[in-house]
């Protein structure tokens, strides 16, 4: 198998899941904007995401694209006031006549006093058609909450569930009958002194419990 590095102008912070739209690939990052690629290897700037904010994620549902992002700047040892918002678009191509994001809607919040920060959105459409959002950072819990796949709104009465702790940048994945939760543990953004590492657990239910390969609950 041939291994190749990405080329072009691939700088991006907190990139989202890569999504295909009309033969091109898109990823979004913290601060707004993102990257576009025609082959998945060579990237250039040009993706457009309004709202700025942090750590977005994106998913295709039917013939539309749902983007989630956080209106907060990052974790804090004392908690962080913030919110996760979702918005739709018919296309991710900023040159298309159909390109227009809907008004963002708040689907999760943190008040600065609880053990969770509303940041680092992760989206998953399960095999049963249910839509899930994970969020949170290393100073508290990772939480999961169910969204309506037709609106992107939080389902009324659905309360977030704590599924992990002391990690961030969570990504929920479904594969072969199992729900997987990938997240990062340690510290980032310190060059060679960074201690970031990826942790993973799996569960038969999207709401957990997620356990690792030796049975430890995340």
Model-identified regions with their sequence ranges:
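Carbohydrate-active catalytic/glycan-binding domains of CAZyme proteins
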Residues: 1-218
């Amino acid at each position: 198998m041939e291994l190749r590095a990405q080329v072009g102008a691939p700088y991006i912070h907190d990139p989202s899941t890569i999504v295909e739209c009309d033969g091109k690939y898109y990823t979004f990052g913290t601060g707004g904007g993102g990257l576009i690629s025609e082959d998945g290897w060579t990237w250039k700037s040009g993706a457009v995401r309004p709202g700025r904010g942090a750590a977005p994620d994106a998913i295709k549902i039917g013939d539309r694209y749902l983007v989630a992002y956080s209106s907060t700047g990052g974790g804090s040892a004392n908690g962080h006031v913030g919110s996760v918002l979702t918005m739709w678009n018919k296309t991710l191509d900023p040159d298309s006549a159909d390109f227009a994001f809907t008004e963002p809607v708040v689907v999760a919040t943190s008040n600065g006093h609880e053990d969770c920060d509303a940041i680092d959105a992760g989206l998953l459409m399960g095999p049963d058609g249910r839509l899930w959002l994970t969020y949170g950072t290393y100073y508290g819990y990772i939480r999961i909450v169910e969204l309506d796949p037709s609106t992107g709104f939080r389902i009324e009465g659905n309360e977030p569930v704590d599924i992990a702790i002391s990690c961030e940048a969570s990504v929920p994945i479904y594969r072969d009958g199992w729900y997987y939760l990938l997240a990062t543990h340690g510290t980032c953004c310190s060059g060679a002194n960074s201690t970031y590492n990826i942790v993973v657990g799996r569960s038969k239910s999207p709401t957990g419990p997620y356990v690792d390969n030796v049975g430890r609950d995340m």
